[in-house]
Amino acid sequence: MARITVEDCLTNMDNRFQLVLVAAKRARQLSMGHQPRVAEENDKPTVIALREIADGHVGREVLDEVVAEEHAAVSSRISEDEVRAEL
């Protein structure tokens, strides 16, 4: 396993801040069971996410994806009015 550097990933990202957001979201997806797009090689999800970015398999588009679980979590929140009615 070769070490992944920020410079390896920045060739496919606009800036470091975007890189952090994309890597974090992709690592979260991998932790939740999404299939890696590169060989796992016994790496942690964060390293796999960075390798995917460096290889060009994952880009900014991952930020635009709305996962069903995320949507369900937002839609299932109790409204403030419902809480007040309970009190």
Swiss-Prot record:
EC number(s) from the headed UniProt entry: 2.7.7.6
GO biological process: DNA-templated transcription
Catalytic activities: RNA(n) + a ribonucleoside 5'-triphosphate = RNA(n+1) + diphosphate
Pfam families noted in UniProt: RNA_pol_Rpb6
SUPFAM superfamilies the record matches: RPB6/omega subunit-like
Source species, domain of life: Bacteria
Transmembrane segments annotated in the record for this chain: none
GO cellular component, one term: DNA-directed RNA polymerase complex
Disulfide bonds: none
Gene3D superfamilies referenced in this protein's UniProt entry, alphabetically: 3.90.940.10
A molecular-function term among this protein's GO annotations: DNA-directed RNA polymerase activity
UniProt keyword annotations, A-Z: DNA-directed RNA polymerase, Nucleotidyltransferase, Transcription, Transferase
The protein's role, per its UniProt record: Promotes RNA polymerase assembly. Latches the N- and C-terminal regions of the beta' subunit thereby facilitating its interaction with the beta and alpha subunits.
Quaternary data: The RNAP catalytic core consists of 2 alpha, 1 beta, 1 beta' and 1 omega subunit. When a sigma factor is associated with the core the holoenzyme is formed, which can initiate transcription.
Family the UniProt entry places it in: Belongs to the RNA polymerase subunit omega family.
HAMAP family: RNApol_bact_RpoZ (MF_00366)
This protein's name: DNA-directed RNA polymerase subunit omega
